[in-house]
Amino acid sequence: MDGLNAAEQRELANRMERKQMKEFMTMYSKLVQRCFDDCVNDFTTKSLISREEGCVMRCVDKFMKGSQRLNERFQEQNAAMMQSGQLPGR
Protein backbone atom coordinates (compact mmCIF):
# COMPACT_ATOMS: atom_id res chain seq x y z
CA MET A 1 0.00 0.00 0.00
CA ASP A 2 3.07 2.26 0.05
CA GLY A 3 2.73 3.35 -3.58
CA LEU A 4 -0.93 4.35 -3.28
CA ASN A 5 -2.32 7.81 -2.66
CA ALA A 6 -4.90 8.42 0.08
CA ALA A 7 -7.92 7.91 -2.20
CA GLU A 8 -6.49 4.66 -3.57
CA GLN A 9 -5.74 3.44 -0.05
CA ARG A 10 -9.33 4.15 1.01
CA GLU A 11 -10.66 2.36 -2.08
CA LEU A 12 -8.43 -0.64 -1.39
CA ALA A 13 -9.50 -0.70 2.27
CA ASN A 14 -13.17 -0.54 1.22
CA ARG A 15 -12.71 -3.39 -1.25
CA MET A 16 -10.94 -5.51 1.34
CA GLU A 17 -13.71 -4.82 3.86
CA ARG A 18 -16.41 -5.80 1.34
CA LYS A 19 -14.50 -8.98 0.46
CA GLN A 20 -14.14 -9.92 4.13
CA MET A 21 -17.85 -9.33 4.71
CA LYS A 22 -18.74 -11.44 1.69
CA GLU A 23 -16.48 -14.25 2.91
CA PHE A 24 -18.01 -14.05 6.39
CA MET A 25 -21.55 -14.19 5.01
CA THR A 26 -20.63 -17.14 2.77
CA MET A 27 -19.12 -19.01 5.73
CA TYR A 28 -22.15 -18.20 7.91
CA SER A 29 -24.55 -19.37 5.21
CA LYS A 30 -22.66 -22.65 4.76
CA LEU A 31 -22.64 -23.19 8.52
CA VAL A 32 -26.37 -22.62 8.81
CA GLN A 33 -27.13 -24.90 5.86
CA ARG A 34 -24.82 -27.68 7.04
CA CYS A 35 -26.05 -27.70 10.63
CA PHE A 36 -29.68 -27.45 9.52
CA ASP A 37 -29.28 -30.35 7.09
CA ASP A 38 -27.46 -32.48 9.67
CA CYS A 39 -29.62 -31.71 12.70
CA VAL A 40 -33.15 -30.64 11.82
CA ASN A 41 -35.49 -33.38 10.64
CA ASP A 42 -38.72 -32.98 12.63
CA PHE A 43 -40.97 -30.50 10.86
CA THR A 44 -44.08 -31.17 12.94
CA THR A 45 -43.31 -28.17 15.15
CA LYS A 46 -41.99 -24.69 14.46
CA SER A 47 -39.48 -24.91 17.31
CA LEU A 48 -36.40 -27.07 17.58
CA ILE A 49 -36.82 -30.11 19.78
CA SER A 50 -34.15 -30.60 22.45
CA ARG A 51 -32.28 -33.24 20.43
CA GLU A 52 -32.10 -30.95 17.40
CA GLU A 53 -31.04 -27.98 19.51
CA GLY A 54 -28.22 -30.00 21.08
CA CYS A 55 -27.14 -31.20 17.66
CA VAL A 56 -27.08 -27.65 16.29
CA MET A 57 -25.04 -26.42 19.26
CA ARG A 58 -22.49 -29.23 18.80
CA CYS A 59 -22.38 -28.64 15.05
CA VAL A 60 -21.72 -24.91 15.45
CA ASP A 61 -19.13 -25.53 18.17
CA LYS A 62 -17.33 -28.10 16.02
CA PHE A 63 -17.36 -25.79 13.01
CA MET A 64 -16.05 -22.83 15.02
CA LYS A 65 -13.27 -24.88 16.63
CA GLY A 66 -12.30 -26.26 13.23
CA SER A 67 -12.23 -22.78 11.72
CA GLN A 68 -10.14 -21.48 14.62
CA ARG A 69 -7.68 -24.37 14.28
CA LEU A 70 -7.41 -23.82 10.53
CA ASN A 71 -6.78 -20.10 11.06
CA GLU A 72 -4.06 -20.85 13.61
CA ARG A 73 -2.32 -23.23 11.20
CA PHE A 74 -2.57 -20.68 8.39
CA GLN A 75 -0.98 -18.02 10.61
CA GLU A 76 1.81 -20.42 11.58
CA GLN A 77 2.50 -21.27 7.94
CA ASN A 78 2.42 -17.61 6.95
CA ALA A 79 4.87 -16.69 9.74
CA ALA A 80 7.19 -19.54 8.72
CA MET A 81 7.09 -18.46 5.07
CA MET A 82 7.80 -14.83 5.99
CA GLN A 83 10.68 -15.88 8.21
CA SER A 84 12.24 -17.98 5.46
CA GLY A 85 11.55 -15.37 2.76
CA GLN A 86 9.19 -17.61 0.78
CA LEU A 87 6.16 -15.34 0.88
CA PRO A 88 4.66 -14.98 -2.63
CA GLY A 89 5.17 -11.64 -4.30
CA ARG A 90 8.30 -10.75 -2.37
Curated annotation (Swiss-Prot):
Keywords: Chaperone, Disulfide bond, Membrane, Metal-binding, Mitochondrion, Mitochondrion inner membrane, Protein transport, Translocation, Transport, Zinc. Heterohexamer; composed of 3 copies of TIM9 and 3 copies of TIM10, named soluble 70 kDa complex. Associates with the TIM22 complex, whose core is composed of TIM22 and TIM54. Interacts with the transmembrane regions of multi-pass transmembrane proteins in transit. Belongs to the small Tim family. The lineage of its organism: Eukaryota, Fungi, Dikarya, Ascomycota, Pezizomycotina. A motif (Twin CX3C motif) lies at residues 35-59. GO terms for molecular function: metal ion binding. One of its GO terms (cellular component) is mitochondrial inner membrane. This is Mitochondrial import inner membrane translocase subunit tim9. Mitochondrial intermembrane chaperone that participates in the import and insertion of multi-pass transmembrane proteins into the mitochondrial inner membrane. Also required for the transfer of beta-barrel precursors from the TOM complex to the sorting and assembly machinery (SAM complex) of the outer membrane. Acts as a chaperone-like protein that protects the hydrophobic precursors from aggregation and guide them through the mitochondrial intermembrane space. Its main location: mitochondrion. The twin CX3C motif contains 4 conserved Cys residues that form 2 disulfide bonds in the mitochondrial intermembrane space. However, during the transit of TIM9 from cytoplasm into mitochondrion, the Cys residues probably coordinate zinc, thereby preventing folding and allowing its transfer across mitochondrial outer membrane. Disulfide bonds join C35-C59, C39-C55. It holds the Pfam family zf-Tim10_DDP. It comes from the Eukaryota. It comes from Emericella nidulans (strain FGSC A4 / ATCC 38163 / CBS 112.46 / NRRL 194 / M139). The keyword Secreted does not apply. One of its GO terms (biological process) is protein transport.
